[in-house]
């Protein structure tokens, strides 16, 4: 008799547990009152709900047509990518999500100060691409392309990947429907963006988006790029190398040039022109004139202190300055006033296609 009672109790407990689990699963998938099964975003929203990425806006609603805010989007991203957020209220949790998304590089600084603003499509796509590690390259890097703002490039890629419609624009405000459909897509599908060709032998040891590096290389004069390739040099994005070099030199480095290895090492694209200046110095054979210009004009050149440490750094910084400000008459006039011989020397180099 006791055995029968125990078995009956076990069966009842098993049944109740199964009923609870079934009810919980059913509750998570019942949907939202304002989201019919015929809605184009139904599958996306239900996927996000089932994976606890969205809980709707309360009272059984999802509010698909309401504009999505930075705060709401940040919460969805953090839930989608298992990023821990802290807080005891929606306000605290969502603010934590915004801060975490900023640290991850998914949102910009504006999000921190204005988490309640509505997102435009360009911003939504840029954030989604950053989270999903989908690279975005400037249109100008492709044959026949033109330079576009960040959001316009995101729209271009979004259309190529069919993540937005042909009629969609970068500045239009997006809805919770749009956000749900986009997030569902990047979580469940694989996307490939063809990288533009590099003008030199490029090694991406850091495995980062090379867009900024390719844009920086566009600033280097073509005759120098041709000489770079002809001489067998390599442009290498290598965070580990630069980090180790910084430790050895006890200073913060973002670029370095190894003449023996014929390699420019970088951890930031902004160092491209300076390091290219070192290559130019090497290409010209380190002429004595460079040392003479340094001794005569470096200290009063108006350039940063680092440029005044030796002739090679002075030459590299002058090259950087002349490329960046070459079309700015006021900035070039400042260099001419402070370092007239140097200014004339670089003007002649430019006329001679950066060779002697």
Residue ranges and their predicted role:
Residues 216-218, 222-356:
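Active-site-flanking segments in enzyme catalytic domains
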Residues 31-32, 53, 212-220:
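Export/targeting segments at the very N-terminus of extracytoplasmic proteins
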Residues 1-27:
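Gram-positive cell-envelope targeting signals
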Residues 19-198:
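N-terminal propeptides
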């Amino acid at each position: 008799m006791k055995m029968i009672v125990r078995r009956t109790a076990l069966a009842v407990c098993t049944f109740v547990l199964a009923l609870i689990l079934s009810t919980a699963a059913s509750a998570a998938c019942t949907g939202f009152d304002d989201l019919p099964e015929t809605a184009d975003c139904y599958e996306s929203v239900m996927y996000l709900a089932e994976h606890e990425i969205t809980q709707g806006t309360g009272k059984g609603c999802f509010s698909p047509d309401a504009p999505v805010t930075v705060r709401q989007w940040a919460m969805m991203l953090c839930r989608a990518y298992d990023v821990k957020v802290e807080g005891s209220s929606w306000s605290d949790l969502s603010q934590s999500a915004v801060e975490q998304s900023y640290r991850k590089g998914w949102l910009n600084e504006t999000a921190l100060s204005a988490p309640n603003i509505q997102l435009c499509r360009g911003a939504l796509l840029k954030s989604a691409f950053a989270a999903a590690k989908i690279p975005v390259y400037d249109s100008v890097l492709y044959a026949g392309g033109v330079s576009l703002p960040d959001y316009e490039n995101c729209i271009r890629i979004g259309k190529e990947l069919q993540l937005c419609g042909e009629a969609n624009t970068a500045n239009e405000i997006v809805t919770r429907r749009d956000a749900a459909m986009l997030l569902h897509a990047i979580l469940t599908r694989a996307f490939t963006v063809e990288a533009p060709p590099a003008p030199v032998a490029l090694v991406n040891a850091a495995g980062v988006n090379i867009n900024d590096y390719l844009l920086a290389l566009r600033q280097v004069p073509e005759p120098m790029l041709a000489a770079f390739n002809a001489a067998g040099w390599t442009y290498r994005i290598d965070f580990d190398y630069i980090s180790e070099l910084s430790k050895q030199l006890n200073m913060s480095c973002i670029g370095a040039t190894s003449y023996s290895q014929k390699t420019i090492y970088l951890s930031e694209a902004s160092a491209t022109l300076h390091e290219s200046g070192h290559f130019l110095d090497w290409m010209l054979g380190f002429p004595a004139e460079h040392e003479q210009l340094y001794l005569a004009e470096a200290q009063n050149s108006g350039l940063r202190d680092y440029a005044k440490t030796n002739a090679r750094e002075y030459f590299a910084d002058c090259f950087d300055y002349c490329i960046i400000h070459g079309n700015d008459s006021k900035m070039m006039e400042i260099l001419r006033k402070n370092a007239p011989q140097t200014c004339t020397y670089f003007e002649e180099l430019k006329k001679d296609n950066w060779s002697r």
